[in-house]
Structure formats: C-alpha cells, structure tokens
Design a protein with these regions (language model features):
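Nucleic-acid endonuclease domains
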Residues: 1-76, 82-150
Length: 150
C-alpha cells in the first residue's frame, strides 16, 4: 500500500480537534468554503457531499480518490468518515440517535481483494484507525441538496 500523503492531509491531533471544534453548531452550508453546494446547484442529491465538505472545507484537504486512508494524524494513517445522525425511526428504540444510512468503509473489488492479505489490505488499513464526524440531520426524511443548508 502506498503511503504518500499530500501535505494538506497531514495533521496533529490538536489541529484536527481545533478544526472540527470550530465547525460545531454550524450548518454544512456555513462551513462550505470550497463552495461544493454552489458547484452542485440544481442537482437533487449528491452522494457524499457532507463528507466532501468536512474533508475539503473544514480540514482543508485537496480532493483525491485514493484507496488509502484519508489523513495522517500524529503519524497514524486515519480514515475519515462523515455521517448524518437522526432521531431513531422506531419509537421504542433505546438509542437517542442513529445513523441516517449505512456507512461504506471502502469499495471492494473481488479481483483485487482475493490477492490481498487481510493485515496489509486497503480494507484493514482504513478500518484500523477511523475518525468519525457526525452531523445532525434534522429532517426525518431524505431531503434534496438545498435541505442540507439548514
């Protein structure tokens, strides 16, 4: 696995804490410095826009689609995952919040994964160290793109 990380993706834990703390109580639109909402204007749905906004606008990372973990934090390769949190759909749920939808860790290609050892696989490298960023998804139903700007 390649471990060449772009300089914009290298952080200390304190830097990550400071950047994410600064985003608390703000909408995705308010933190969208990369203007991703404007870029996708007119589209009903853009899969992964919340994660892209956190990665590009809050953390300031340059866009990439590499199969390796997203950032390096204090020398540790770390996968960044962003997911919306909602009130539970079931009235008798013991939970205060639940994920809006299932979260994908990585795309699995059968011809590739069968030739990998688990301990050195892209899947394991992503799973080993994960940073979860949650945002409050106010609507009980899926909204169009402009609905994220609450």
């Amino acid at each position: 696995m390649s471990t060449t990380i772009e300089p914009s993706r290298i952080f200390t834990r304190q830097q990550v804490d400071d950047l994410l703390t600064a985003a608390i109580n703000k909408t995705l639109l308010q933190v969208d410095k990369a203007k991703l909402f404007a870029h996708h204007e007119g589209r009903d749905k853009v899969k992964g826009i919340a994660g892209d906004i956190i990665e590009e606008s809050v953390l300031g990372c340059k866009k990439d689609s590499k199969q390796e973990p997203d950032i390096l934090v204090d020398g540790v390769l770390t996968e960044l995952k962003t997911t919306g949190m909602i009130e539970p759909k079931k009235k008798d749920s013991p939970y205060v919040y639940e994920c809006k939808e299932p979260v994908s860790i990585t795309a699995v290609s059968i011809p590739v994964i069968v030739n990998e050892e688990f301990e050195t696989s892209n899947f394991w490298h992503k799973l080993a160290h994960m940073l979860w960023v949650y945002y409050w998804y106010k609507s009980p139903v899926t909204v169009k793109l402009e609905g994220y700007s609450w």
